[in-house]
């Protein structure tokens, strides 16, 4: 590995780490909105705590993907072709999660807000789980041919260890969100998050 490759590898690693550090509490707050928050005021307080920052944090993912594409195009191509289904589901989750913030805001009924809050929670659980599933699969290794194409099937990279990795990343994001809410909120919601964390 040359010095330039090492430099870009570190940059991509820092960008993905920044994404998981900054976006992790967003996912955790979304999870807490459907599990810890029990009434309308607590849900609004939880979601309002990430309102100004959630979309900015996703820029780290775009930058990491762009840096990976620019510096390691074969890695990028193998990743996207080999983990196509998981990345597609992550993209669907990111779309639903982003739309949820706007649709909750413009929903005029309590039932509509409740539905979009549940969509936010489900997407917030699914996205870190799928990222953990994918990264654990990458760490385990996936079969590739001589041209760098991934020859794995769905069951090759979705196994017991990768599911454990997905659950671990999901729980880590939830813990991150619980701690964030314990710092940024007050009243009963703060006490509940502090107790669970």
Where is each model-derived feature located?
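Long, contiguous internal "core" modules enriched in hydrophobic/ aromatic residues
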Residues: 103-197
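N-terminal signal-anchor module of multipass membrane proteins
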Residues: 1-56, 62-65
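Membrane-helix interfacial "entry" motifs
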Residues: 1, 41, 48, 74-81, ...
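Membrane-interface helix-loop-helix modules in multi-pass inner-membrane proteins
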Residues: 53-124, 145
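Helix-coil boundary and interhelical linker segments in multi-pass alpha-helical membrane proteins
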Residues: 1-12, 69-84, 136-162
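Membrane-water interface of transmembrane alpha-helices
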Residues: 22-32, 91-103, 171-181
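Alpha-helical transmembrane segments
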Residues: 8-19, 80-93, 121-125, 156-171
